[in-house]
Amino acid sequence: MAVSYNKLWKLLIDKKMSKVELRKATGISPNTMTKLNRDEEVTLTVLCKICSALSVDIGDIIEYIPTKDEEDLNEEKN
């Protein structure tokens, strides 16, 4: 499973908020911010903190990107 946080970064630009400001507003660790920068999975708690700080829904900050294997599996089911 792959995720992308591009929506989050675009939202920060729109809100004129830096990643450091987001980290401070949410209390998430620098290591967690690194995971977000690398499009790695983080906990639902972290995502909820971000949503709360930005007053948005989870779909506004994250996008699910199916892997090739997942796409193939879905095609087999259909």
Model regions and ranges:
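A short, Lys/Arg-rich alpha-helix, primarily the initiator
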Residues: 1-18
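The alpha-helix within a helix-turn-helix
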Residues: 12, 23, 37, 51
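Short, charged recognition helix plus adjacent turn
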Residues: 2, 62-78
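Short, basic-rich loop-to-helix N-cap that marks the start of a DNA-contacting helix
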Residues: 40-52
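Residues within the helices of the helix-turn-helix
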Residues: 9, 20, 48, 59
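Short alpha-helical DNA-recognition segment
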Residues: 16-34
